[in-house]
Amino acid sequence: MSLRTSPLSSAHEALGARLVDFGGWEMPLSYPSGTVAEHLACRRSAAVFDVSHLGTVRVEGPGSFEVLQGELSNDLRKIAPGRAQYTHLLNDEGGVLDDIIVWWVSDDRFDVMPNASNTDRVVSRIGGTDVTTERAVIAVQGPGAREIVARVSEEAARVPHFGVSGFDFGGVPCLVAGTGYTGEDGVECAVPVDAAVSLWQAILDAGATPAGLGARDTLRLEAGLPLHGHELAPDITPLEAGLGWVVGWNKEAFTGRQALDIIRQRGGPARRLAGLLTDQRRPPREGDPVLSEGRTVGSVTSGNYSPVLERGIALAFVPSSTPNGETVEIDLRGKPTAAEVVKPPFHRMHPSSRAARP
């Protein structure tokens, strides 16, 4: 099966990007500068990412609110038109089928943003129209992100954290949300395909560093943000992942609610997601066993080298009774390596990014 391509593919090729298969899409993993340099550019100034592989499912018309309120875990009554919300699509057992950002664009229009490989699954549950191929999504992230975006569109740069608004780019109507997946301030712009390359180039010309999905992953890991298929999955609940705040406990009903209620009534989940901080540069990897007193108590779900901390870091599920500050061991390909159990994030996130999305 051929890979789907981003509207920005030609721009990535011109920049010498290393392109890889990501969820059925050919996307840039990195550029010639390399993942570490791209990561640090985002932490220190601003980086621009192509995230067009993320789906967009448009749900609109009368009854749209009620459909989403009944299918998604979070409570849309917490927000209003012109706002975005992080939420989950759950199965009957309370497991996470996908984690999603909902852009509430106007009274009866919602743009639901699932992960690349889960768009069809989301459409089958909530209905709506898959408009992924009609637009590109460009994320500008970092402490200098808004300053750079303002050089292209002051209107887009003014969008508040988790706000959603329209902006004009060269006469083309676009959408922007104050969302991201890096632990930094920033925005994500949805732009019609025909204007995508022009907007990308304008952001580069304004001073942003192009960054690939490799840097996006190390950034989200430093920020302690979960990735579906790793820290979230159909057999992992929001409660295990430390995301109970994504559950609308005051809602009357939604798929998976009963299972989550039972877990709470039993005193909570048996395992929890924790951070693991090593004192070595060698990175833990997914699947590495986590041991306590010689006994396997969990496994790494995501691990990598932290360019900011200059050491290996990981996320892992451990028994809920495991306290922060305890020392465990990670079996790093046959080499026991000490790690401290810590509460993510590993990197101090920008104050406006503490609820940022995967």
Model-derived regions: residue spans:
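Conserved, structured C-terminal
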Residues: 1-23, 27-30, 103-358
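Well-ordered mid-protein domain cores that form the structural environment of catalytic cofactors
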Residues: 75-122
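Acidic active-site catalytic centers that drive phospho-/nucleotidyl reactions
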Residues: 50, 99, 188
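Acidic, proline/glycine-enriched N-terminal capping motif
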Residues: 1-90, 95, 214
